[in-house]
Amino acid sequence: MSNMNQTIMDAFHFRHATKQFDPQKKVSKEDFETILESGRLSPSSLGLEPWKFVVIQDQALRDELKAHSWGAAKQLDTASHFVLIFARKNVTSRSPYVQHMLRDIKKYEAQTIPAVEQKFDAFQADFHISDNDQALYDWSSKQTYIALGNMMTTAALLGIDSCPMEGFSLDTVTDILANKGILDTEQFGLSVMVAFGYRQQEPPKNKTRQAYEDVIEWVGPKE
């Protein structure tokens, strides 16, 4: 195994869902910016980046969220950095956001945009993304998990611990964030939380995973 391959495998064996961080140890600004950039630079379906990353460092807000986040209580107390990942709503071909992405970010020529919109609509129909608002939002939310995974892997490569979390009251937390002007519920929904820092102690047991042959199947020669 090459040095790079070993480095990657070591990072995946190092990573675990850290329940309690050492509150005295903080992730450096440089390292955390690298983690955020790995999220921002992540791939997404059609390259539309339907996400927003909100870093919650205000302890009073963390305490308020903790009361309604049973799966994140210890992390909210102890994590060096705590991130909420929002998923964008209404990502359709003619929505203002998609038009902004096509015209201002991707710089499509105006005459090519109708053809792009047509292909976009066909894709969403074929994949049942445009069936209803929930399907459309779920598609956006799926993209946030790509960024989430990349952020946690980047952290592990830097020797930083992390924990992804869905253990919260979605409606209540959404209301808190909306009332504080942090979450525009017309544009976004809260997809997932993730905490970063340094473990308070080693995991109580070794990482467990199913065997390679139970989850991986080759069709054709294994090369």
Swiss-Prot record:
Keyword vocabulary terms for this entry: Flavoprotein, FMN, NAD, NADP, Oxidoreductase
Regions annotated as coiled coil: none
Listed CDD domains: NfsB-like
GO MF terms, alphabetically ordered: oxidoreductase activity
Gene3D superfamilies: NADH Oxidase
Any GO CC annotation of this UniProt entry: cytosol
Matches recorded under InterPro entries: NfsB-like, Nitroreductase, Nitroreductase-like, Nitroreductase/BluB
Cofactor(s) in the UniProt record: FMN
Database matches in Pfam families: Nitroreductase
Family under the similarity heading: Belongs to the nitroreductase family.
Protein name (Swiss-Prot/TrEMBL): Putative NAD(P)H nitroreductase SAOUHSC_02829
